[in-house]
Amino acid sequence: PTILRRQRQMCIRDSLWGSLDGSILLWNLCLSIFMFFYLKYYKIENSNLDIKIFSFITIFFVGYTVFSSSPFAGCIELAIVGCNKSTLIPFQNTFMSDLGRGPNPLLQNHPLMAIHPPMLYIGYVGMTLPFVAATSRLFKRDQSDDWIEVAEKTTYVPWLFLTIGITLGAAWSYEVLGWGGYWAWDPVENVSFIPWLLATAFLHSSKIQKSSKTLLNWNYILVGLMFLSTIFGTFVTRSGVLISVHAFSNGNIGTYLLFGLTIFSLLFIFIGSKNIEYFSDSKKITNWFGKSGFFVLNNIILFSSALVIFIGTIFPLFYETIYDRQITIGRAYYDILVGPMLLVLLGL
């Protein structure tokens, strides 16, 4: 109790996203805010389909909160305890309700707890916006470039927040975990880096589509993978299927997220395969040594890096499933394969 009393009010408040149920509640809040501003500031013709796609995604996450989690269960439990221990006035003599249970020891009394998780959540949830813009246009077989403008603008915000979140997370790991470095290629670190790489690739390739009418199909694929990678990242972080110092598993969220990831992936593939032919007449890149060629090389490197990191992250899971033995992929794998690609990228 003494430790809890000394916790700063900030850390008590930040316990909202320190728990599983609270973090999903925060996800729903961010998604609702993003949806409001998207529909308010992007006056898109026939936006009913955008609303339906948003609603479908929102129902999925709200569904977990409604049917499988109870973010206020602790408050209710403490209230009941308070009533039982009160004499004349309910809650006056409670010994827990004013203190709470406190966050995980790794999360206690650190200022970055107030910044790092929300930054990542805003970055993750924000990837829904370009996905909605691209999917609705593809579904309507709209061959105009309106969607790429919307998708590009709505990618900048989550990309920026992901950048801040990843940077702060690296600093936090260096200070708290004490492994002598800012980045250890931990699975949870990897799954936050993958959508950042894909979003960076899209922000480059979208400019090529606007200027030369190429890479239409590729941009749709990137936008879809950006969104799916955020669901995958949340699955890895919250399910505990992979060994990570950052993973906090609890309840049946892993199964629920895996189900959602499967459904969203199948819908993405189905809609794309049914309608992608309407976007297959884009022009071809002719000058590979010009701006377009370098942007394509940039995309190849970024996507390849994301793919290598994804394979290295999930390989232990498949290995354990097949051979019933746990393994980990060391940093040498990433340093050898990803390191040179990122160095080439810096040269571009």
Residues covered by each model-derived region:
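Single conserved hydrophobic/aromatic residue that forms the stacking wall/gate
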Residues: 1-4, 8, 12
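Membrane-helix interface motif
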Residues: 5, 67-80, 89, 175, ...
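Mature extracytoplasmic enzyme cores
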Residues: 19-74, 107, 114, 121-125
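Hydrophobic cores of alpha-helical transmembrane segments in multi-pass inner/ER membrane proteins
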Residues: 22-35, 120-134, 191-206, 256-277, ...
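Membrane-interfacial loop-to-helix junctions in multi-pass inner-membrane proteins
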Residues: 37-59, 139-160, 208-224, 249-256, ...
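Carboxylate/His-rich catalytic cores and anion/metal-binding grooves
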Residues: 43-93, 128-164
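Interfacial helix-loop-helix junctions of multi-pass membrane proteins
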Residues: 168-190, 240-247
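Long hydrophobic segments that form regular secondary structure
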Residues: 243, 247-348
